[in-house]
């Protein structure tokens, strides 16, 4: 499936993006190549191939859920102009 300049302009319009006229032919060529590759992948025989979430049979090693950093809230909030109950107070912007 070949994408022409008019289709690139239509896609750009639908995506609400501006494309320079001199770049349209390059985008048309690139999109045509992408669609050809997708078509090629669609023609691959995947019967009997087990779906997988990851190409390697690996598990994520999780560390124990332990506190590793000290609580520095008061230190960080010491420079704030207004704090209440551990929360930063900011000026009201909506009445």
UniProtKB/Swiss-Prot annotation:
Matching entries from InterPro entries are given as: Asp/Glu-ADT_sf_sub_c, GatC
| Gene Ontology molecular function terms on file | asparaginyl-tRNA synthase (glutamine-hydrolyzing) activity; ATP binding; glutaminyl-tRNA synthase (glutamine-hydrolyzing) activity
Question: Which reaction is catalysed here?
Answer: L-glutamyl-tRNA(Gln) + L-glutamine + ATP + H2O = L-glutaminyl-tRNA(Gln) + L-glutamate + ADP + phosphate + H(+); L-aspartyl-tRNA(Asn) + L-glutamine + ATP + H2O = L-asparaginyl-tRNA(Asn) + L-glutamate + ADP + phosphate + 2 H(+)
Family in the record: Belongs to the GatC family.
- What is the name of the protein in this document? Aspartyl/glutamyl-tRNA(Asn/Gln) amidotransferase subunit C
- The disulfides recorded in the entry are none
Described function: Allows the formation of correctly charged Asn-tRNA(Asn) or Gln-tRNA(Gln) through the transamidation of misacylated Asp-tRNA(Asn) or Glu-tRNA(Gln) in organisms which lack either or both of asparaginyl-tRNA or glutaminyl-tRNA synthetases. The reaction takes place in the presence of glutamine and ATP through an activated phospho-Asp-tRNA(Asn) or phospho-Glu-tRNA(Gln).
Which branch of life, at top level? Bacteria
Q: Which organism is it from?
A: Halorhodospira halophila (strain DSM 244 / SL1) (Ectothiorhodospira halophila (strain DSM 244 / SL1))
Annotated HAMAP family: GatC (MF_00122)
Q: Does the keyword Ligase apply?
A: yes
